[in-house]
Amino acid sequence: INDNLEQQAKLLYDYWFTQFDFPDESGKPYRSSGGKMVWNEQLKRDIPSGWKVIPFLEVASWESNSQPPKSEFIYEPQEGYVRFIQNRDYESNTHITYIPLTKNLSIVDRFDILMDKYGDAGAVRYGIEGAFNVALGKICAHNQNYREYIRSFLSSDGIYNFLHNSCMASTRASLNESNLAILNIPIPDEKLILGYEKILCKMRLSILKNNDETQKLIDLRDWLLPMLMNGQATIND
């Protein structure tokens, strides 16, 4: 289900902001219905009339976290501690780690945008609340109404490939703010941004709810299976 929702979100972004067939004032697809397009020298392509193109770092900023010593790690939730988000946590919940909550830590909620700095550099992450490690960077939208548009922009194939390849071409192979500084982002009118934000927020909520339900089933399986195997529990016909 979540793969389908993610694919729908990607298709909607492509339809509205790459093909420019967002609904016009009559509800018809803008470009296909003859909407006015103008050449943009920065992007080297036509964009809808009235849109502007600005440096990416005018709509968002980059934030990093420090790396606490491993001696501070604990592996069960405890008061005064916060979850320590690592890249691997987006693939599995089997190595959950907690660290002391301090004022120096940057904390993210489940909707905030994170990005891999190493390995799969440029991959966009979200869905876990806590403090992120040094292998991740936070993308802070200056206007929260632009968060889903920014997330989709960064997740698009062209931008991901550009960031990943530009990072891999460097000697350290680490994504940082300088990679984002190269980007330019098209800015549609406010009404279109708000409409997109409303649709995508509903999708994100559904995705996170599905993740929670899936995790509950996994936890139940992990609790019940050992008891079934050693005979502590049985299933009645």
Predicted regions span which residues?
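Short coil/turn segments at secondary-structure boundaries
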Residues: G27-K28, P69-P77, H164-C167
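A short beta-sheet element
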Residues: Q86, N104-Y160, H164-S178
